[in-house]
Swiss-Prot record, chain A:
Name of this protein: Oligopeptide transport ATP-binding protein AppF
Main location: membrane
PROSITE patterns linked: ABC_TRANSPORTER_1, ABC_TRANSPORTER_2
Lineage, highest ranks first: Bacteria, Bacillati, Bacillota, Bacilli, Bacillales
Domain ABC transporter, residue spans: 10-261
UniProtKB/Swiss-Prot annotation, chain B:
Binding site for ATP: G41, E42, S43, G44, S45, G46, K47, S48
Protein's UniProt name: Oligopeptide transport ATP-binding protein AppD
One Pfam family cited in the UniProt record for this chain: oligo_HPY
CDD domains: ABC_NikE_OppD_transporters
Record bears the keyword Protein transport: yes
Top-level lineage group: Bacteria
Any GO MF annotation of the entry: ATP hydrolysis activity
Subcellular location, record wording: Cell membrane
Topology with respect to the bilayer: Peripheral membrane protein
Domain ABC transporter, residue spans: 5-256
InterPro entries xrefs: AAA+_ATPase, ABC_Ni/Peptide_Import, ABC_transporter-like_ATP-bd, ABC_transporter-like_CS, Oligopep_ABC_C, P-loop_NTPase
Amino acid sequence: MTAANQETILELRDVKKYFPIRSGLFQRKVGDVKAVDGVSFSLKKGETLGIVGESGCGKSTAGRTMIRLYKPTEGQILFKGQDISNLSEEKLRKSVRKNIQMVFQDPFASLNPRKTLRSIIKEPFNTHNMYTMRERNEKVEELLARVGLHPSFAGRYPHEFSGGQRQRIGIARALTLNPELIIADEPVSALDVSIQAQVINLMEELQEEFNLTYLFISHDLSVVRHISDRVGVMYLGKMMELTGKHELYDNPLHPYTQALLSSVPVTRKRGSVKRERIVLKGELPSPANPPKGCVFHTRCPVAKPICKEQIPEFKEAAPSHFVACHLYS
Amino acid sequence: MSTLLEVNNLKTYFFRKKEPIPAVDGVDFHISKGETVALVGESGSGKSITSLSIMGLVQSSGGKIMDGSIKLEDKDLTSFTENDYCKIRGNEVSMIFQEPMTSLNPVLTIGEQITEVLIYHKNMKKKEARQRAVELLQMVGFSRAEQIMKEYPHRLSGGMRQRVMIAIALSCNPKLLIADEPTTALDVTIQAQVLELMKDLCQKFNTSILLITHDLGVVSEAADRVIVMYCGQVVENATVDDLFLEPLHPYTEGLLTSIPVIDGEIDKLNAIKGSVPTPDNLPPGCRFAPRCPKAMDKCWTNQPSLLTHKSGRTVRCFLYEEEGAEQS
């Protein structure tokens, strides 16, 4: 899908989300967990942007901030040109939430166990006061059929379904209001491989049918390569590299991206060349106390003295290939 | 290479209202000394129950070994009592569990947990055991091993805890290491560290590994031979190269084509339709028949047996019956 000259649907400008650390008798603020620390990118209509990174890199927080489940500490979120970073809950519900929906990671925790599928999927209609009762029920059955579940399942409860089926229910719920943008936070990582493929194929079909835009958050680099048009790599709350998927996987510029890609185990055919693996030393530093300068310099195999001092700028190193690294400035 | 572990026709059943539920239903395989064998399958395929049966840990969760034998060198583990097992667990056979978050004791320090094994199995004095524990921690890549000894598990990250688990598992130089999804809960860069470490250590001590995983990438990197399980049965047994080059069983083929690859493009993923049947509701014929794209009439009614295909690979599928007959 070419999304190059399509309209921008969502834009993030230097968005930060800090969570305060409180301690002591009066619960005074003693510091911040910098979960998302200055992230800028834009999403074009109809494209899929994949966000990858290790746990704790802020990819989920970024996703949740975009849909305004969290209020950003700083920065602007523009949805179709409108700044939604400071809107009140009521205004959000009226103007934005209909158009941005979310699919969550854990299909066992994200569905209310006391409600039937019908009332789970119908709930957005109630909230937004759409359609008559009868139309609502018809819509529910239509949606269930669309995601590959039998419409007669509408009266059942979530516990009667397997993980893959529940994720389909989560997708049906996200589709109820005909959104333009769906934020999918690790939608397939809790599923078995054969089921994972079913859900990925379903998401691709739906995208074509409803002209959806996806923000696909995942730690699985192979899945992200399969589904995305462009991919962003996050590390400790910062975007390290962002470019088209072919460019990113064939020609990664940032040392972190290179290490990340090389550590993915691949199914290797006999006779094929074994890739050189870059094993990173140490662990992800705590986002409450990120390293000075480039956040990656503590684990970087090619760190220079300047990396300890100065934060590298996130800029275009090659046409539409953005990278935050001193090697390319 | 001599055989270290031999599992023959193992059947482990669980019971619900006296109804038997066959979680593992006739599994045969062997592991040679120094070999890494991967046990692959989706959740519910019985791979973890197979490993728990070897460790003698199914009885405590209500399971029962109904039939078959598990031979570790010349000892038959199925006839072992709990006391006998205590002597070999951690000593000759040890296990790394999937959840590094829950498999360490939260109220004991790392040092206490490592020395416990050494004092029990190797009759070491406390001081001696401490020294050895520090060495072990250094071996698994901790630079400040002395401090780590005094830490509690909650102070460590997932990757560090998994390395501690590996240190404990290898503390008595076991002959067999069972690793149940050792890297599933870890990030890729940490996963690479842990896999690298397991490989190094096993070469050094000539330990055999039974690696249980659903990640075919990990299998391809780390294993010598692969056993594919489906619904409590072995459906294919082959070397890594053979399996990835030419999968025989339709289920193996489905698994291989349903994963997106990182170094290439697939237009549309080939999803296996349907889902794994539960062990209390198995189809009467071949257990994969309802999901199989190549199912024939007899697949729905008859159960295929494990056939020996040319080149010594085994596969449980009627498609290869003709070839198998020619062979024998």
